């Protein structure tokens, strides 16, 4: 060994041994003094300040959107929006309203996005695919709680069309007709078997919990055909199911402003997420539930394949999830991750907004005795023998006052308040004298469309009569609870079906009487734009007592 290494080299190597290290480190070089470190930190700070200054100058004066009106602070930074949506819990929509009041029908609401408040332009922006391709705003996709890959969170127009195609048959009018008996059955179980069983007990019932349970069971039946009503049959209508969506909605603005949090949750165990933050844990548990349902669909597919090979009957009906895993989508579109996120979107979007509208409608019907009496009288023509004889959806849709009540409820509950930003990827958009560059996110909100005084006089009043008699083209144009165009709400027909059956059963002649308990307008009137509209966050819900 010594023959290969001279003494000086052996001494140097020995100096690396732990026992020798303390005496062989050289002294700290002079250039690493505290003064120099402070200067280095100052230089880094100066570079960062120059970068921020340059970014602000670009956004205010050089950006393609610099020509559009709006507050300078909104053009400079997205933190202006984040402040109102995170600190004030979904209040930016009201700031946008003030911007339009001050600056006009088109405003720049953040460094990258425009908002338009002009009812006549809606049909120009939200178009079908044969007119113009429409992409989704990338920042929205990144912030919608790990739904990337689902049809809802797909940016590309063409890819969205491919992903949505297998879903459309289930939620078409014809598809909902096939599901009608199931919805009618679950309606009877909720209203007759559960709610009316509380008659004379004095028990306070939260209708928002009951309706969330109902909508959850409906969409679960569609997706995986669960044999039992997991939520409706729960003693208190599975309040955790409601709380999961409520907490999730409250957290959405934070995730949209800081999408990196989603990636953190993605790799975090559900138990740890729950410990750190209740809403984070809710998302993790919801994801696990959707994964289980997707695996159930895959097991059904395996049983189907086995039964076909053995000439046995195929087990069960073809559920939506089973249809997805058995579809002719390319392999990349059938990955576990993407299908799991699709499942989360279908179950989540099929539950919360419809249930919220049911509670909203019940409140306004109950506080208006004339509306309640007129609705009950009209329902008598098809509900006299209920539940022994159930009306069809088509029969309910022929009742003009029932349809007017539903339309007015959807108008005032908005469907969603949030602006649905759309992107024209290759063509510029024209709005009055403005040319909007391709690739610019542009949004419009049902909150503005549904409150247009020219179209809907006395817009904040619940007036079903406005939908009777002559309905003007402007009313049809402005009525957008499910949006329009190539990306309109997939579950529109299902929502109408559920609303018809629930209201018919709740307010039919001879139904067990129920009254509001400790509930006022603040418990239903939307005041927070959390993607879905929500009333005051400390509300105790729509509570009733069956007399």
From Swiss-Prot:
Subcellular location: Membrane
Catalytic function, reaction form: ophiobolin F + 4 reduced [NADPH--hemoprotein reductase] + 4 O2 = ophiobolin C + 4 oxidized [NADPH--hemoprotein reductase] + 6 H2O + 4 H(+)
GO molecular function, one term: monooxygenase activity
Topology within the bilayer: Multi-pass membrane protein
Keyword Heme appears in the UniProt entry: yes
Glycosylation positions in this chain: 277
Assigned keywords, A-Z: Glycoprotein, Heme, Iron, Membrane, Metal-binding, Monooxygenase, Oxidoreductase, Transmembrane, Transmembrane helix
Signal peptide: none
Pfam families associated with the record: p450
Primary role: Cytochrome P450 monooxygenase; part of the gene cluster that mediates the biosynthesis of the sesterterpenes ophiobolins, fungal phytotoxins with potential anti-cancer activities. The first step of the pathway is performed by the sesterterpene synthase oblA that possesses both prenyl transferase and terpene cyclase activity, converting isopentenyl diphosphate and dimethylallyl diphosphate into geranylfarnesyl diphosphate (GFPP) and further converting GFPP into ophiobolin F, respectively. Other sesterterpenoids (C(25) terpenoids) are found as minor products of oblA.
Family listed: Belongs to the cytochrome P450 family.
Protein name stated in the entry: Cytochrome P450 monooxygenase oblB
Source organism of this protein record: Emericella variicolor (Aspergillus stellatus)
Classification lineage: Eukaryota, Fungi, Dikarya, Ascomycota, Pezizomycotina
Gene that specifies this protein: oblB
């Amino acid at each position: 060994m010594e023959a290969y290494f001279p003494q000086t080299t052996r001494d140097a190597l020995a100096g690396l041994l732990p026992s020798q290290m303390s005496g062989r480190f050289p002294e700290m070089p002079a250039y690493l003094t505290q003064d120099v470190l402070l200067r280095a930190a100052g230089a880094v700070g100066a570079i960062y300040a120059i970068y921020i200054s340059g970014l602000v100058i670009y956004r205010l004066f050089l950006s393609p959107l610099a020509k559009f009106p709006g507050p300078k602070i909104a053009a400079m930074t997205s933190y202006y929006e984040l402040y109102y949506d995170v600190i004030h819990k979904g209040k930016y929509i009201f700031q946008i309203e003030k911007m339009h009041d001050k600056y006009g029908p088109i405003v720049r609401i953040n460094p990258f996005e425009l908002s338009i408040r002009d009812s006549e332009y809606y049909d120009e922006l939200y178009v079908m695919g044969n007119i113009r391709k429409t992409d989704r705003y990338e920042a929205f996709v990144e912030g919608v709680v790990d739904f990337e890959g689902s049809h809802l969170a797909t940016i590309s127009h063409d890819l969205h069309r491919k992903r949505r195609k297998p879903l459309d048959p289930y939620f078409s009018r014809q598809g909902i007709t096939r599901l009608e008996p199931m919805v009618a059955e679950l309606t009877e179980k909720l209203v007759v078997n559960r709610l009316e069983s509380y008659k004379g007990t004095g028990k306070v019932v939260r209708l928002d919990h009951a309706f969330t349970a109902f909508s959850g069971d409906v969409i679960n039946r569609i997706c995986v055909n669960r044999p039992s009503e997991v939520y409706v049959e729960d003693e208190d209508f599975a309040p955790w199911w409601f709380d999961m969506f409520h907490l999730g909605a409250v957290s959405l603005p934070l995730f949209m402003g800081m999408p990196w949090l989603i990636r953190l949750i993605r790799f975090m165990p559900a138990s740890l997420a729950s410990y750190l933050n209740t809403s984070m844990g809710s998302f993790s548990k919801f994801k696990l539930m959707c994964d289980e349902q997707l695996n159930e669909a895959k097991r059904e597919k395996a049983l189907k394949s086995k039964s076909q090979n053995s000439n046995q009957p195929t087990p069960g009906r073809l559920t939506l999830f089973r249809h997805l895993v058995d579809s002719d989508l390319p392999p990349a579109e059938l990955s576990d991750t993407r299908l799991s996120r699709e499942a989360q979107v279908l179950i989540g979007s099929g539950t919360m907004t419809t249930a919220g509208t049911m509670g909203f409608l019940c409140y306004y019907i109950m506080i208006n005795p004339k509306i309640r009496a007129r609705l009950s009288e009209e329902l008598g023509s098809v509900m006299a023998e209920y539940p022994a004889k159930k009306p069809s959806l088509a029969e309910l849709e022929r009742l003009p006052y029932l349809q007017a009540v539903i339309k007015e409820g959807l108008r005032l509950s908005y469907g969603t308040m949030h602006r649905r930003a759309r992107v024209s990827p290759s063509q510029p958009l024209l709005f009055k004298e403005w040319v909007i560059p391709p690739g610019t996110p542009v949004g419009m909100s049902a909150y503005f469309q549904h409150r247009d005084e020219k179209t809907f006089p006395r817009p904040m009043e619940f007036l079903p009569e406005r939908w009777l008699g002559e309905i003007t083209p402007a009313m049809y144009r402005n009525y957008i609870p499910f949006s329009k165009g190539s990306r309109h709400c997939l579950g529109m027909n299902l929502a109408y079906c559920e609303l018809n059956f629930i209201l018919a059963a709740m307010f039919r002649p001879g139904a067990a009487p129920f009254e509001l308990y400790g509930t006022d307008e603040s418990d239903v009137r939307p005041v927070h734009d959390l993607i879905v509209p929500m009333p005051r966050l400390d509300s105790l819900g729509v509570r009733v007592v069956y007399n």
